[in-house]
Amino acid sequence: MPLSLACSGLGHACSFLGDHATAAKSVEKGIKIQIDAGIEWWLPLHYVFLSAVCFNSGDLEKARRHTEKALQLSQSNSERWSEGQSFIWLGRILGRSYPSKRDEAEEDILRGIKILEELNSKPFSTLGCLFLGECYLETGEKEKAMENLKGAEVMFQQMGMEYWRDRTRKLMEMI
């Protein structure tokens, strides 16, 4: 299992660097290793990573399918952390793909944030707040966007998560 997570984590990182083809191959390799080993535990996380890779490359339809797979697996395996991540990504993808479904996107992101807060997973619930602010910004709701982004910025600063703090600040500059 550590090898599969290493492959998927590497792919996720490659996606942030803009190398989406390598990213997808690496995450898919991680998924294959995990499936071949017959281990379902943490498999949803691999699909969340693959979803993020597809999202970052602009393939929102594939991102949605992978997130739905992650959500289904996380619920069937009772993996609450992955379920929270899946809801956040599902909402982010929905909001970007269909701005008219902003309410549904908001609901999904908030559901994911709530799950992650219940698990005391502050870095990831804060990421959900960033994505919610991004969703509001993309639908022209500047006040709601700023409220969520300011909260996320403070939390990222407190946790020393400079990359995400800086991304949050860039979004705030757009308001």
Residues of each region from the PLM?
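Helix-coil-helix junctions within alpha-helical repeat/solenoid scaffolds
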Residues: M1-I175
